[in-house]
Amino acid sequence: MSGGEASITGRTAPELNASAAPLDDERELGETVAATALLLAIILVTIVGNSLVIISVFTYRPLRSVQNFFVVSLAVADLTVALFVLPLNVAYRLLNQWLLGSYLCQMWLTCDILCCTSSILNLCVIALDRYWAITDPINYAQKRTIRRVNTMIAAVWALSLVISVPPLLGWNDWPAQFTEDTPCTLTQERLFVVYSSSGSFFIPLIIMSVVYAKIFFATKRRLRERTRKLGTLAVPAPPQRTSSRPLAELESVASQEDETEPSPEPEPLSSRADKPANGISVHQFIEEKQRISLSKERKAARVLGVIMGVFVVCWLPFFLMYAIVPFCTNCAPPSQRVVDFVTWLGYVNSSLNPIIYTIYNKDFRTAFSRLLRCDRRMS
């Protein structure tokens, strides 16, 4: 076969191998350049997106609410991932070796666990906050004070430290001697893997799944109730129910069933002034408020699916690999490409969080637009 190939091509097998080597090198170089460009783009999007979230909450008045402190904490966690974890990961993959020594390797890995864990735990706290706001809006509105929110945020970061620091205190299987050829990887000490994966992902995943399921079913129940109310509102109001109450009072009555939702855009004063103060207009006004609320709750139910779906898709592959590999001694270890892919898939969640948690919010979109246009009317 080799002689036939040489006579057809006019080149021997060694010559063919030598000519194929540059092609392989060029292909590998192209893949490296493309992958690096993609990873740098992810870092840039993560930094810009989360920075916009933080600046918007502190500079745009409609966003200066207590519940948005949770979103700021999430954005800070995701921003630290982009600033302190991802750049070193890119450099490590490009050089294919760790050149910064044992101490910086351990600090980098600890920072990785800390930042990613705090991001996931912030998602969990946001889920709990939404659950309490929907299921017990009146009481929770009184309990949701700045002090309580700050305490919850501090607890998230403290728990993240408790989960991430033990390897620095000796709970690890890192080699005693560290050279340039020593890989800088997370410890595979089995008890710590169980401890950290449970606290960082699996327990928050269970909590978020239960909470979002309860939110979803509570939302469906409220949708059914409001649909029935709309059916009763469809009956024309009798003449004797004519009312001349001020519009502000009517808004208060109509919004009693919608206390946990943001208010719709206010109508121009001219259009308000044109409304007759009779029973028919009151009926139409309340019906419209109910329809707006129904639309918002349907949208909120869809957003819940997006939030949970993206979180699971991004982080589940990594934590399955992280939790299984140390215990499967007879299994073939995953390739470096697989490890890199599932690791960066988890990191991508930090770039998607500001998009998911803000793209459905008109106030955030307005704040982003004004910031990007350098509009001074932010406050």
UniProtKB/Swiss-Prot annotation:
Chain positions covered by the region annotation Disordered: 234-276
Localization terms from the record: Cell membrane
Domain of life: Eukaryota
Keyword Secreted: no
Cellular component GO terms held in the UniProt record: plasma membrane
Family according to the record: Belongs to the G-protein coupled receptor 1 family.
Known role: Probable G-protein coupled receptor for an amine.
Protein name as catalogued: Probable G-protein coupled receptor No18
Organism: Amphibalanus amphitrite (Striped barnacle)
